[in-house]
Structures are given as C-alpha cells and as structure tokens.
C-alpha cells in the first residue's frame, strides 16, 4: 500500500509499504529512497496521529492504513552537531597548525585540530587574503548550508510549521503550547517537538517579572506574559545556559546601582547590542532575563525596580541619523582577536556557507555568544535587510 510522509517544512513524499512491516523497516525504506545523508534511519522519528511509532511495532498495529500519512522528523544525534566534512580536517600525522583567520577572507582556511584558533574580528581591508588552504569540495559547502538551515524556520515558514506540528499532534496540543515550545527551541521545529513530548527544560521555562505598566509594544507584552507549559526535564539539547552577558557588564551593574536607574546600562555598548537582539527577536527575552538573574542578579533587580525605563529601552529605536544597526558597536566593545575552538570555527564556516558576509557572520556569532542556532536564526530573519542595506 502507499502512504504519504510529511516533513515539518511542509513537503510530502510517498513510499510503498506493507501493513505487516515493522516501523524499523519503514525507516530503512525512507533512508533508501530519500538518501542516507538526508534521513538516516537511526535518527528518524515517525509520528502517526500524535503518537511516536516504536521500531518493533508494525504499521497494522499502529492503525496505519492505505493513504494514511506519517510525519517524519530527525532526532538530534550526539554526532550531528560535531560532524564536519572530512576534507576540512588536517591529516592526523601532521603537527597541529595555528591559523589567523581574517574577518572576510577570499578563501576558506582549514579547520585545525588545535585546542584554540585565533580569529581576527577587526574590520578587513578589501585586499585581505587567507593563508593557502586546500580546496574544499562544493558538495561540502552544500552540506554546511543544509546543516545550518535545515532545522530553523522563520518568516512565512513559521506559520506552516505551527500548523504541521498541530496536525502531527492530532489535537493533543493547542496553539499556545506549540508556540511556547518553538520559542524555547528558538524556532527549531525538531527540537520543539521533542520539548512537546518530553517537556521544556527548566532552564528554558522561566517566568518574566510582570511589568507594572502597559508596555508600549503589544508584541513585547505578549512575550512577557506568555503562559509557561509544564516543565518536566532539566536536560535536553537546549538545556545549557545561554551566557548572553559578557564580562564587561558586572562593572556596569556597579555603576548603575550608584545611579539608581538604567543610565549606565543605556551607555554600555554590549548591553545595547543585546537590546538590539531582543528588539529583532523578542523570543530571546525570557532566556536572556534568566541568564541575567544567574550571572548578574544586581542588574536584574535594577531592571525590576525600573521596569518602565527598561521597556522604554527595548522599544526605543537605535540612535544615529542613519539608524545604524547596533551590531556596529560590537567590534569596538570586544578585543580585536578572540580565540575560538575548532568546533566554533566550523560553526562560523557553516554560517558563512549560508551566503552571508564573513564580517557580518562574526559580528552576529559573537553577539549571540557563539550560539550557532541563535546566530543562524537572526541572520535568516534579517537576510532581506542585509541584502538591501549591506552588513551592519
């Protein structure tokens, strides 16, 4: 019999199966027909009428009939985040080289298996070139692009993803719960579905202090008062803290406490950069405030005591006649050279492979505290602005 298989992005394909076949066999059929690099059987999760199908059960036992449809998603395997094309690694019998990568080189440099790799963040000159590097196959760049974009949705695709997840649940979830899971997963549909089945990690499920006045922006109000779904697990792919606040901010908190308001924070370039990210993507406000409470409770207390001024900071436009993006201030606030690990350098290359300028990628990557998914989400959400106005 023929059944349809839907993806979270809305695409559909058909496969020929037998009702007596086990779910594990169906996964292998999908792997064979669609490609092992796209849908590896061991990472597949098949869902029918809101139920995750077990490998040792048959289609008949799960009431999968002719012309039924399954929803497919991929589990985030341990090796998926660290995987990289073999051509990008140096031979193991050579001494680990150290490289300095310009902010916008003419060609990619190899990823070295050293513990840290210095990356120059300062603005490049048009003639800047990288040290000679072995050519990377075109197919590996395509793989990098797929890895960076396949798990994120934004813009018009977001509504289609919400509807797809609602259909997947077969009515067991309402829209608010799905939106909450997507918010906690930073618009990663696969991770959001995992949260719906296993619970949103405690680190991502926090209340925001209730404002004492009506916010100027209704969107900000809806984000601040969004109801929390039941939290079950304290572990998961997004369980690690976001550490969105750099080391320069503790001094700012001391100055701000002396003033009794947010003037010191208003003039802090890094804090202004974080505010610009919140303005662009209000969904990060909750985890940002949570991490602020962990790393600098004095600033969080100051924000709670000056909620009206904080809301004004969030809603006010960027300063300057040309309304320059606040990310322009980030290179001035950070050291000119920052050491990154090989894994972080691979993340930078994957973001570059999406077609963005390297200087822009570095600015956003470090502004998002080296969170690859958050940086990719920001770049995708604002790609039209970058095309029209150039990099910030």
Swiss-Prot record:
Residues 156-199, 342-382 form the UBA domain. SUPFAM superfamilies: UBA-like, Ubiquitin-like, XPC-binding domain. The keyword Transferase does not apply. It is found in: Nucleus. Residues 80-109, 209-237 are annotated as: Disordered. InterPro entries: Rad23, STI1_HS-bd, UBA, UBA-like_sf, Ubiquitin-like_dom, Ubiquitin-like_domsf, XPC-bd, XPC-bd_sf. One of its GO terms (biological process) is nucleotide-excision repair. The keyword Nucleus applies. Residues 1-79 form the Ubiquitin-like domain. Pfam families: UBA (PF00627), ubiquitin (PF00240), XPC-binding (PF09280). Residues 214-231 have a biased composition (Low complexity). Coiled coil: none annotated. Residues 260-303 form the STI1 domain. Keywords: DNA damage, DNA repair, Nucleus, Repeat. GO terms for cellular component: cytosol; nucleoplasm. Transmembrane segments: none annotated. Mostly expressed in vegetative tissues. GO terms for molecular function: damaged DNA binding; polyubiquitin modification-dependent protein binding; proteasome binding; ubiquitin binding. NCBIfam families: rad23. May be involved in nucleotide excision repair. Binds and presumably selects ubiquitin-conjugates for destruction. Prefers multiubiquitin chains rather than single ubiquitins, with a binding affinity for 'Lys-48'-linked ubiquitin chains. Acts as a ubiquitin receptor that associates with the 26S proteasomal docking subunit RPN10 for the indirect recognition of ubiquitinated substrates of ubiquitin/26S proteasome-mediated proteolysis (UPP). Interacts with 'Lys-48'-linked polyubiquitin chains. Interacts with RPN10. Interacts with VP1. Belongs to the RAD23 family. This is Probable ubiquitin receptor RAD23. The gene is RAD23.
